[in-house]
Amino acid sequence: MKKITAAITGVQGYVPNYILTNKELETMVETNDEWIRSRTGIKERRILKGEGKGTSVLGIEAVRGLLKKINIDAQEVDLIICATATPDMIFPSTACIIADKVGATNAFAYDLMAACSGFLYAISTASKFIETGTYKKVIVVGADKMSSIVDYQDR
């Protein structure tokens, strides 16, 4: 029996257009650019704006870009795992929303919620599905819309 080995065959990212700068944060909370940079190294953050736009929007854009980049039809995808701490809603899962919007009609899809380690768990889980022969083409999405849970007034 031939051993199946999982491999990462493509990587794609997506960030929203809106940029929240440290200068803007100065108007929301008692802080300044130098204080933030010296303690965190953060200069700016990308924020997904718009009514009803959730984490799935980030995943949809990234998956569309990935499918185009590696030249795979969405219907060839067997499984989508979305690692997120900020799902759009309890159900349907963010992964199911992504699968639907990108046209991955043959894919199983589920969310894996394990905070910061979620993406690592999702990669590990995906590799096991591939190596056991359960699925061939698996997409792992790591996405969070932290702006939906961050209190910008809390220093």
Where on the chain are the PLM-derived regions?
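Acyl-thioester C-C bond-transforming condensing/cleaving domain
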Residues: K2-K3, T27, K68-A74, P87-R155
